[in-house]
C-alpha cells in the first residue's frame, strides 16, 4: 500500500519544557503509516530554514519519502507553541512569520505523483480546500476535519466533500444521537465513513448511518500530541483492502479496535532543545 500524506508541516514547540517536535497532521500520518509498514510519502511545501531541516530529518529517519516536496527558498516553517503538563497540551500561539511557506500549490507534477497513491490523507490544516478535487483520483481519500467549528459548516463541507471515503473529526464526548446528527451532512454529501475520536471517551464510526462504537484502552499517556493522527491509521490500513467508495462495516470495526491504544502516549520524534 502506498500512502501519500498531503498538506501541512509544523514545529510543535513545548514552551514550558523548551522541547520541539516535528508535527502537522500530514507529517504525523506519514510517519505512523511508515511505522505500520506502508510505503509512505509526505507531500507538502518545505521551507529552507533550520526548522524545515528538523522536519525533513525526522521524516527521512522514519522511512518517509519526501523527494517530491517543493523546497521554497527563503521561506520559513510554521511553529505552534504549547504548554504541556502531565501529558496534556494547552495551545498558546502560532508563529508563522512574514515568510511562511504557506499551503502546497498542486501543479501537474504533484498531480501525477498523487495518481500513484493507493491512499491519500489530507486535512483542514493543509489550508488548501479549493484544491481538494484531487479526491477524483482513484486512491482512497481520507480527510481530517479537526476540532474547530469553522471546518464543520455547510459552506466548508460543500467546498471539500467531492469524493471522501473517510472523514475524521476530533470531538468532545457525545452520545450516538448527537454523533448521528454530526454525520448526517457528511453522509448527504457522499462521505461513506465518518470517524469521531473523543479522547478518553473512545471512538465512534458511522458507515452510511450504521454506527460502531468502541471504548478506549486506558494507559498512562506521556504525550497526547498526534494521538488522533495515529488513531486513524489502523482503520485506514484495514480499509484500503476495500474498493474505493464501498462501505465496509467490518473494516471499520477492526480499525477502531486497533485504535484503542495506538494513539495514546505516542510521541512522534524528539529533537532536543529549541530556543526562540
Where are these regions (language model features)?
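Ribokinase/PfkB-type carbohydrate-kinase core domain
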Residues: 1-4, 58-60, 66-70, 85-212, ...
